[in-house]
Structures are given as structure tokens and as C-alpha cells.
Design a protein with these regions (language model features):
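Cleavable N-terminal export/targeting peptides
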Residues: 1-53, 280-293
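Transmembrane beta-barrel domains of Gram-negative outer membranes and organellar outer membranes
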Residues: 44-293
Length: 293
């Protein structure tokens, strides 16, 4: 029943999306949606995470996790950053993302408003938008490339000089591939729609990550992030950092990013803490394979 509903939603989204003006990024997304819809024929829910699996977060890299949180679990991810751009220094927090597993392979997430404090120009400080989303793990079978589809929208609740005007929907596809000896690759393709923006109606974001597990609890990563607006030049930066699991349900992390061109921040330094609470509410969970290792 869940796969039928998900496939129907994706099919309708693809149909509506195809009616919009097309860019190269939108062509790629339409193709991805059709592949996702086709995959519902054979996709099974028995490989998605359970409470026996360790916490996997969307931090500290820009690339989000390709897997969902377990059914009935609530995951809270937080962080604080310090950044510099064009002579201004900004401190932002708490960058809180709430992730709830509402069914096998399906989660509901919300990015809560984050406060951006401009150290040199306090009048340019304020809150970002609240952004709810649905995330569906498409390829849950262990041993293969993990892939998820996310559809969300940033609602116009933030401060005018921090958040853009109007609602901003987005469609996102994070993926990951575990290699041998603790190495892994991951990435993400996102299309942001900005119908109220007079200069650029859309931004395509691509990321690519190389990760290495250095101990049973710690791992390091290097990440490329590129934002490509429909009009104007891109913003590109290199991000690196690591994470440490205090327990199966708790994580500490850090990251350091350096801008690669003048459109990106000069630097970003941040730290974070995430925690998962299991079996908080009832959610449907299908039989599954043994937990991942």
C-alpha cells in the first residue's frame, strides 16, 4: 500500500513538473523521477533502518543521508556555525532538523528557523524559514547503492533580509555507495524553485563526498558543493570534517569549509550534536534483513 501511494505521488509530481520551463537540471530530475517510479515495482521495505541500526544524520556535510530514520523514532540534529563573507562575520544556530520515521522507508522532516547573527551589522540579522519535507528511501536493499527522494518547501516565515520572498519548493535526491575497507562515496542532486525571485527562478545544487571510516565510531569526509543558479555565476566551496558517535543514538560532528570563488563564503566553521529517540510512537514496520554492519 505504501509503495502504491508513493509511486502515485511521484507520478503526479513528475507530470506537474514537466509542465514547467525546462533546464538541464530539470531534465535530469524528470528522468530521476521516472526511474524512481519504475523502481516501486520491485522496491521492498525490508532493508530500511530499524532501531538496531546506529544513528545516521544529515550532518555535518551538506549532502544529506540517503537513508531514513527508523519507524517510530525521532531524530534531532543541531549545529552552530561561524562564517565570513564580503567582510561580514555571521554566527548561526541552532540549525535544528527534526526527523520522524512515520513508516518503513518514509520520514517526515522539518528544518526549524535558524537565527543568523551578523556581528558587524546587527540590522542584517534574523531568522530563516521553516521548511517541512517528506523523504522516501527508494533503494533499501543492503549491499546496493542507497537512494532517497525528498520533496520539501521553505515557507515564507523568516526575516525579510535573511529569507527569500515567497514559498520555495525543492526536490532532492541523496545517494550513497559503501566501498571496501571503510571507504564510501555519496552525493546529492537538488533543484530549488524560487518563483518569487525576480532574478533567478531556480538553483541547481550538486554535491560529491568521499568518506573514510577511521574507527568503529569515527569517520572523516571531504565534500564538493556547487550551487548553479539559472542566471548568474555559481557558488562553489570545499567542505571537510568528521563525526564521532558517542553511543549508537548520539553523534558529535565538526566541519570546515573554504570558498572556491567569490560567490561562496570565505570560510565556514561549525560543530554539532545529534540524538535519536526510539519507539516514541507507533509506526508501521515491515519485516527486514538483518541490521547493517
Amino acid at each position: 500500500m505504501l509503495d502504491d501511494k508513493s509511486g502515485s505521488i511521484i507520478a503526479r509530481t513528475a507530470s506537474a513538473f514537466a509542465c514547467a520551463p525546462l533546464t538541464v537540471g530539470k531534465h535530469a530530475i524528470i528522468l530521476a523521477i521516472l526511474l524512481v517510479y519504475h523502481s516501486t515495482i520491485s522496491a521492498k521495505a525490508d532493508g530500511c533502518p530499524s532501531i538496531k541500526d546506529e544513528i545516521i544524520t544529515d550532518r555535518p556535510d551538506v549532502t544529506n543521508s540517503s537513508v531514513v530514520v527508523p519507524p517510530g523514532s525521532l531524530q534531532i540534529e543541531n549545529g552552530v556555525n561561524s562564517s565570513a563573507r564580503d567582510g561580514d562575520r555571521v554566527i548561526d544556530g541552532t540549525n535544528t532538523r527534526l526527523r520522524a520515521g512515520i513508516a518503513s522507508c518514509l520520514e517526515f522532516l522539518v528544518d526549524t528557523p535558524t537565527y543568523f547573527a551578523n556581528v558587524r551589522s546587527p540590522q542584517n540579522s534574523g531568522f530563516s524559514d521553516v521548511a517541512p519535507a517528506l523523504k522516501w528511501q527508494i533503494s533499501p536493499v543492503p549491499g546496493k547503492i542507497d537512494l532517497s527522494a525528498v520533496f520539501g518547501v521553505a515557507l515564507p516565515t523568516g526575516t525579510a533580509n535573511i529569507a527569500s520572498a515567497g514559498a520555495q519548493p525543492y526536490l532532492q535526491f541523496p545517494w550513497s555507495w559503501e566501498l571496501r575497507h571503510g571507504w564510501g562515496l555519496s552525493g546529492m542532486f537538488t533543484e530549488f524553485f524560487r518563483p518569487s525571485d525576480p532574478t533567478s527562478k531556480g538553483i541547481t545544487e550538486t554535491t560529491f563526498v568521499i568518506e573514510k571510516k577511521v574507527t568503529e565510531r569515527a569517520s572523516l569526509f571531504v565534500e564538493y558543493v556547487g550551487d548553479y543558479p539559472e542566471s548568474g555565476s555559481p557558488a562553489q566551496f570545499l567542505n571537510s570534517g568528521g563525526l564521532y558517535r558517542l553511543s549508537p543514538n548520539q553523534q558529535l560532528d565538526f566541519h570546515v569549509a573554504l570558498g572556491l570563488n567569490h560567490n561562496a563564503p570565505s570560510y565556514v566553521v561549525g560543530v554539532g550534536y545529534s540524538v535519536r529517540f526510539d519507539e516514541l510512537f507507533s509506526a508501521n514496520e515491515a519485516p527486514r534483513y538483518p541490521p547493517r554492519k
